[in-house]
Design a protein with these regions (language model features):
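Intrinsically disordered, low-complexity regulatory segments enriched in Ser/Thr/Pro
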Residues: 89-118
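Short, compact, well-ordered microdomains
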Residues: 115-160
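Basic nucleic-acid-binding interfaces
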Residues: 55-63, 113-117, 122-124
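Long, low-complexity, charged/polar intrinsically disordered regions in eukaryotic proteins
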Residues: 35-100
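Residues in the recognition helix of alpha-helical DNA-binding motifs
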Residues: 3, 10-14, 137-140
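Short coil turns linking two alpha-helices in DNA-binding domains
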Residues: 7-10, 33
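Short Lys/Arg-enriched helix C-cap and helix-to-coil transition segments
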Residues: 2, 19-39, 152-154
């Protein structure tokens, strides 16, 4: 430092940073979470911009294993079934601790179409229609920002948005 006439901070600023691993073969869990979060944000933004069945499907794929809560506060997650050809079947497997339920894609689409017709607050899941599994679809549509719900229900579902 006496040789260069620079301060200690200046000398260290020119040295390469050695504390981090760049372009590692395996990414950290935090990096994976950040990547998933960005993908989910992008899919939801696209769905809000262009509310189509295809964009809904892409959002559904992105939110697999996301911790949702029903309007009554019961936690659940879903996964998509994988078909024989290795692609996703359009069937959601709802994972509720002890029980697993299957939810058809047609039910999700029906609730989605009904949500587009509703402009005011959706007070309860059944307001979207008499649809099988609507209590699980309701928090998903709310999380995607497609419906508004009462504040009391929002608190039970965890204010995730």
């Amino acid at each position: 430092m006496k040789l260069t006439g620079l301060s200690r901070a200046s000398v260290h600023s020119y040295l390469p940073y050695t504390k981090g691993i760049y372009n590692a073969a395996e990414i950290s869990l935090n990096a994976e979470r950040c990547r998933t979060y960005k993908i989910r944000q992008e899919k939801v933004r696209l769905l809000k911009e262009i509310p189509s069945e295809e964009n809904l499907w892409q959002s559904i794929i992105a939110f697999q294993d996301y911790p949702f809560k029903t309007a009554t506060g019961l936690p659940f997650r879903y996964k998509l079934k994988i078909g024989k050809n290795g692609e996703y079947n359009r069937e959601l497997l709802i994972d509720r601790r002890e029980k697993s339920k299957s939810l058809a894609w047609s039910s999700v689409v029906l609730a989605f179409e009904n949500s587009k017709k509703v402009s005011e607050e959706v007070k309860k899941p059944k307001a979207l229609g008499d649809i099988r599994g609507v209590s699980y679809i309701y928090p998903i549509l709310w999380r995607f920002g497609l419906i508004r719900v009462p504040e009391a229900i929002e608190k039970k579902m965890g204010k995730q948005r």
